[in-house]
Amino acid sequence: MSPLKLEPLLQTLASRSDDIEAARRLPADLAQEMAKAGLFRMMIPKTLGGLQLPAIESLKIMQEVAAADTSAGWCTMISATSAYKSGFLDHDTGREIYGDPMGIYGGIFAPMGRAVPEGDGYRVSGRWSWASGSANCTWLSGGAMVFEGGEMRKLPNGAPDSRMVIFPAAQAELHDTWHSHGLKGTGSGDMSVTDILVPASRAVSLMKSAPTHEGALYRFPTFGLLSLGIAAVALGNAKAMIGDLVDLAASKKPTGGGKVLAQRGYAQTGLAQATAALRSADAFVTEAVGRAWDEAEAGDDLSVAARADLRLAATHATRTSAEAARTLYDLAGGDSVFLKSPLQRRFRDAHVMTQHMMVNPATWELTGRVAFGLPTDATFL
């Protein structure tokens, strides 16, 4: 059971799915209601007024929200995982950014920005794509490569020095570039900043910054959490499709014969297979997160094997969800092609999620190398 009281909010989100998609962003009043419910504070330390939930609880909540409305679930995931950086900031900076109980956060990990050291900070410019939920955010963040003397700065291990720079949302320009066929309501357009000064205290290194707050959550890998968040939204979306199909099948009579769809053998088989696939994928996620959580609670750095399992489970769940969505969409026949059908929207949403770099097919190779015991660059595990 969710530690948050979400049922009235979930009903509201479900009833306004058409509005969310038409707006191509999460309406401001809904974003405020979601903030009030605590959805954006799940991964913020308790010492900063956050919830600091166990990873699996946050993921289950993301599923619940996505089952109500996928775009709202996606925005929940992005804001929560963006706020995860709070566990790596000094306490004063953390309170400045994450102390507001109504704060909304967003960001893009991809290092599309450029950060040049200046005084006790960085002069930052950049433009980032996929800035989901940015129109409602109070703080935004973006990945940036550090340059010194015109050259990219390297870490001792030879990797580029990449930082997540955090800045007030008012300093960013938002660009209306989000014209997609799925996840339409996420407002995932571009954002940019030009020549802003970001204090060093608001520039987190994903490669070398150590947690500044206690707890197993902050020993989890950043990319593992992000990929699992995507998987949670995908699973919630696809599970909701099962209910949509069951509702339709009770009365739909396919051409040929008098039986409703629910009485057709092929529909029963397809529904059973989709259900089994989704429950199995969900179980793999739960198993992988549980194993990693046990290691993190022991105070250890997560093993490469545990980190690989997180990425593998996330990619498998996201792609399995899209396959199940295809099955359910097909079973609905011609009814699924109309815009009034929730099945067509969820089908589109499912397939947009598979395109995220954290769950793309390259993950199979990365985790397969670990399974074979081959030397593997574990940076993105």
Where are these regions (language model features)?
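C-terminal helix-coil-helix/basic helical segment that borders enzyme active sites and/or dimer interfaces
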Residues: A14, D18-E21, S280-H316, R326-V337
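N-terminal glycine-rich anion-binding loops that anchor highly charged ligand groups
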Residues: R25-R41
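Internal helix-loop-helix
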Residues: K36-M102
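A structural signal for short hydrophobic beta-strand segments in well-ordered beta-sheet cores
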Residues: G113-P117
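DPxDG-like acidic metal-binding loop motif
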Residues: R127-Q171
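Glycine-rich beta->alpha junctions and the first turn(s) of the following alpha-helix
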Residues: H181-L278
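Generic structural signal for well-ordered, non-transmembrane alpha-helical segments
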Residues: G236, A272-R279, R311, T315-A322, ...
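Glycine-rich phosphate/cofactor-binding loops in nucleotide/flavin-utilizing enzymes
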Residues: G334-L381
